[in-house]
Curated annotation (Swiss-Prot):
UniProt keyword terms in alphabetical order: Disulfide bond, Endoplasmic reticulum, Glycoprotein, Isomerase, Phagocytosis, Redox-active center, Repeat, Signal
GO CC terms, sorted: cell surface; endomembrane system; endoplasmic reticulum; endoplasmic reticulum lumen
GO aspect biological process, one term: response to endoplasmic reticulum stress
Keyword Glycoprotein attributed: yes
Protein name, per record: Protein disulfide-isomerase A6 homolog
Xref: Pfam families: Thioredox_PDIA6_C, Thioredoxin
Domain Thioredoxin: 20-119, 120-267
Signal sequence residues: 1-19
Segments crossing the lipid bilayer: none
Lineage, uppermost ranks: Eukaryota, Metazoa, Ecdysozoa, Arthropoda, Hexapoda
Residue interval(s) of motif Prevents secretion from ER: 430-433
Disulphide-bridged cysteine pairs: C55-C58, C186-C189
Keyword Transit peptide attached: no
Molecular function per GO: protein disulfide isomerase activity; protein-disulfide reductase activity
Amino acid sequence: MRQLASILLLAFVVGSVSAFYSPSDGVVELTPSNFDREVLKDDAIWVVEFYAPWCGHCQSLVPEYKKLAKALKGVVKVGSVNADADSTLSGQFGVRGFPTIKIFGANKKSPTDYNGQRTAKAIAEAALAEVKKKVQGVLGGGGGSSSGGSGSSSGDDVIELTEDNFDKLVLNSDDIWLVEFFAPWCGHCKNLAPEWAKAAKELKGKVKLGALDATAHQSKAAEYNVRGYPTIKFFPAGSKRASDAQEYDGGRTASDIVSWASDKHVANVPAPELIEIINESTFETACEGKPLCVVSVLPHILDCDAKCRNKFLDTLRTLGEKFKQKQWGWAWAEGGQQLALEESLEVGGFGYPAMAVVNFKKMKFSVLKGSFSKDGINEFLRDISYGRGHTAPVRGAKKPAIVSVDPWDGKDGQLPTEEDIDLSDIDLDKDEL
């Protein structure tokens, strides 16, 4: 009976996993068996999401992705890959985390990583930019993204802004923008042009760079109080007004512009997902490719009930939000489930909860010695971010083996049921050793 229940439960889980998108959503299910035929050998441009069913951010993306497929129907094809079911494609295209969105444009062998806002509108804009690029390539034209006399343009990387399209492209978009107001005769503008173009190329998919000829569009320049050239304004992510524009105060080399804009982009990224380590895949998703990985080991559910555990998890999420600019990975496991991990990081032996911060590239880690509280962890992570604190080599100098376990169901633990013993077969009158 228990075996039958397990089979039914497995069938339910598998059914739930495959229910992310249905044929009626317009999202094509892609697998290793049909990917080449559907995507690589097709002339159409594709937007492809690589996801894992257990990933919270993937689940949050579902309604926007369905909306995207509906909006792009007949223009751009939209597909999805369940990377948890088969890692072949995610490995082939270097997918390190979920969800990962790639746009397969004219050069199918070199898809573009999409790193912008996870909204249907923002993703659609990126996809349509690929359509425009492909059309211009076929026609042999450079397109209309030139920034005039400033020479700031390089293909589609620097976007030409005018009085007619400024509000629509900049203010009404969710993207981060840097806008250069220039004059064609300005020497400093001409010097900035190649640096601006180079920065735009490096920041593609993260921050949009535009250029507006202030001599041709004087009313727009006046609206933003432009008094000299070049003037660079920063427009934050999300819905914005003209009053939200800020002065750019960085340097004028490509590296300066990229560094300044990247800091703004990182500040706008969502908080990292706190991932439960239930198998090798979840462990890699949480920690692979991250500068550091914050690994917490929480008490067994019988020692710390659902309310207790959720309190710990809320603390970790709060701190993940605070340190999100570091782009660290965040993971947790129940004490005793991943013994090899605990042994390699020397945690758990002195009790739970415990924490270690790991640099898997250097195979070094540091253990939280203070209180597992918001203040205690904050102080520990602050020291780590400043390069302070004691570090030790990961035992064995290799990543620990991760075993597959069931994910926590969010409920209190249940003590194992004791089986009733039939005393009728036991002769209580005999003394036996």
